[in-house]
Amino acid sequence: MGIQAQPDEQGNIDESQLPTLYLPVNQTVEIKLNSRDVIHSFWIIDFLYKKDMYIGKDNYWSFTPTREGEYAGKCAELCGEYHSMMLFNVKVVSEAEYDSYLASLEAAGNTGNINEAYDRLQNLPGTGNSSEGDE
């Protein structure tokens, strides 16, 4: 999940600066979850459900948001030094607003996954990425 929140000098977090996951209302969504470093837990508090994220294993969460609104999300697994900074927002919007938001991301060149170079544990045994080989 990474560090999502950047506190100010007094330790306060400006929630408007957190990353926001946009979801279309009344449309089934499937989220693919995996971890780049340690076990995390993807939690959207008002959805009353969380899903664990593991290294080297994809986990899926399928659901249908039924109410437009803004919701808080966070990592629910004590995962390390910056655990309390792993915060995000969720915005459930109309299908038209969702499509418009996706178009704005694409126009800005924001498509696809984050580069694998950001994987902290890309040399785990069995991944085939070790510089010394997997012998």
Give the positions of each predicted feature:
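Non-transmembrane, membrane-proximal soluble domains of secreted or membrane proteins
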Residues: M1-E135
